[in-house]
Amino acid sequence: MSKPDRYVSFVGIDGDSNARKLVALLRRHIDDPARTNRFWELFKDKLEKINKPDETSGFSQDELYLVHAYINNIRELFETYDDQPALALLDRIEAESC
């Protein structure tokens, strides 16, 4: 199978699944009291509101949306802790889905 072209179609790209995997990698860091801060605590609140539009003024958020919206913050965290597998997945998501 050829490499999917995000500018033509998202066929063959599982952005939602990749974003959920990335959030799981992110949670390993931000759920650690020594690595979290006010920003990440607020981010976790956003994660708790996924697929709850009644709590987000009618706007349905998902993991992929949050990854895209906070990609630079997420990248900085992974770079800080030299999390190479997470950075590789983040690069893939950025290339395929952003």
Curated annotation (Swiss-Prot):
Record key words, sorted: Nitrogen fixation
UniProt xrefs under InterPro entries: CowN (IPR024899)
UniProt function note: Is required to sustain N(2)-dependent growth in the presence of low levels of carbon monoxide (CO). Probably acts by protecting the N(2) fixation ability of the nitrogenase complex, which is inactivated in the presence of CO.
Protein's UniProt name: N(2)-fixation sustaining protein CowN
Disulfide bonds: none
Homology family: Belongs to the CowN family.
High-level lineage: Bacteria, Pseudomonadati, Thermodesulfobacteriota, Desulfuromonadia, Geobacterales
Protein's UniProt keywords contain Lipid metabolism: no
Keyword Nucleotide-binding belongs to the record: no
Biological-process GO terms, alphabetical: nitrogen fixation
